[in-house]
Amino acid sequence: MRPLLEMRGITKRFPGVVALDGVDFELLPGEVHVLLGENGAGKSTLIKILSGAYRPDGGEILMDGRPVEIRSAAEARRLGISTIYQEFNLVPQLTVAENIHLGRQPRRFGVVDRGAMERAARELLERLGIRVDPRARVADLGVARRQMVEIAKALGLRARVLIMDEPTAALSEREVRQLFRIVRRLKEEGVGVVFISHHLEEVAEIGERVTVLRDGRLVGRVSADAGRDELVRMMVGRSIEEQFPRRRTEPGEVLLEVRGLGRRGVLRDVSLRVRAGEIVGVAGLVGAGRTELARAIFGLDPADSGEVLVEGRPLEAPGPQEARRRGVGFVTEDRQGQGIVPPLSVAENLALASLERYLRGRVLVDRGRLLRRAREIVQSLRIRTPSLEQEIRYLSGGNQQKAVIGRWMLAGSRVLIMDEPTRGVDVGAKVEIYELMNRLTEEGAGILMISSEMPEVLGMSDRVLVMSGGRITGELPAEEATQERVMGLATAGSEAAVG
């Protein structure tokens, strides 16, 4: 069978970096070809070349056996190439229907036909099994539903080649099943899918072949049913003996206590404790209230009732500034939207939460001392960046995430609320983040970890709190926590209204 898409000897250089070095890739009609590699391996550069964001410095691209040049995103779309990026490409102020049809709205007598646009959007959403009102503003949707709208938008373009960059990162298990059903339907129609994922368990389930990149080079191409150990070895160049290297420490004093926290419509009478030296995991289905709990504790979304205590004392004026001042840090689930400031440098992003700690007098920042400490953090966390002055937007997702965590280390936080700490992070970087979490707890910090990845919750938590319907439905010590028990608690009372 002739390939639908071929990339031969693709090379791309940036100042001081060879991002791609003679990489080959091919995609057959109706094939799901999985692209694997650590952050910084070259995956993002490869798909940006295919989507028209970058132009290669060498090599050629063929569609249906004919050479093509992809000079822009519009040209990629004209060739039938559509990309769903890991970070959202939606306009929050517009409705779901407007985002799905952006740039190609149906018109009648020269005017946008909103009825036709909303009907078409509704049909597409129903095809995907997404329960979202096409008239809803994207800004009012959670991360999972925004991701599904992004997928609907791309599929609405009727692409022949669909590039999916971490499409399942923000989805629940049920939503992943829905997505996979749609992908299989696209395969039957002859659409080729380039599927990028860090979830190795998805590879054999959805893919036919796997191409692995490392440090900008092609490591090899294997069948999707290759074992996990082989794939990990190809990705990182070494074996990972233990994916979740949790080192248990003896819990100390209570650092964070939440008493009867409530917020109308999302949280109901939530109480919990986090001690020094422990990781408390929070599990639950999408919509259970986990992120809302994290934001309420940190003061981003004020609670209607209850209180938050840090080291035994209530927060005097609940809010992010007070929480930060008292030693609480927050790693958001939305890295691009709320975690980093893309135009600022790595050093500036690291310093965002701790400038007052480096003041000389009342106004001037001791830049030398701050940069020395920031450099220590970068080296300690192995953040791959040409310099501290590099704009953080040019770092890979994994290095950006390590910088967000490093920000709170620089601030000296003793309590860390981590919402999806390894979302969009590759296997090797995940282990580095887990080791960092171990180090923080060994140094006396307490971590409240919210995660949609069940193996992560079970593998890294000392205790697991399970949420459903805005309340905590159960608590399990690590030795008693199983996927079955967690899921049982996660579905308990999920239909109950939150008061």
From Swiss-Prot:
Query: Which EC number(s) does UniProt give?
Result: 7.5.2.7
Annotated catalysed reactions: D-ribose(out) + ATP + H2O = D-ribose(in) + ADP + phosphate + H(+)
- The name under which this protein is listed is Ribose import ATP-binding protein RbsA 1
Q: What is the protein's known function?
A: Part of the ABC transporter complex RbsABC involved in ribose import. Responsible for energy coupling to the transport system.
Q: Which residues bind ATP?
A: 37-44
Give the UniProt keywords, A-Z.
ATP-binding, Cell membrane, Membrane, Nucleotide-binding, Repeat, Sugar transport, Translocase, Transport
Q: Which family does it belong to?
A: Belongs to the ABC transporter superfamily. Ribose importer (TC 3.A.1.2.1) family.
Q: Which Pfam families match?
A: ABC_tran (PF00005)
* Keyword hit for Transport: yes
Q: How does it assemble?
A: The complex is composed of an ATP-binding protein (RbsA), two transmembrane proteins (RbsC) and a solute-binding protein (RbsB).
Q: How does it sit in the membrane?
A: Peripheral membrane protein
UniProt cross-references to InterPro entries, sorted A to Z:
AAA+_ATPase, ABC_carbohydrate_import_ATPase, ABC_transporter-like_ATP-bd, ABC_transporter-like_CS, P-loop_NTPase
Give the originating organism. Answer: Rubrobacter xylanophilus (strain DSM 9941 / JCM 11954 / NBRC 16129 / PRD-1)
Q: Which Gene3D superfamilies match?
A: P-loop containing nucleotide triphosphate hydrolases
User: What compartments host this protein?
Assistant: Cell membrane
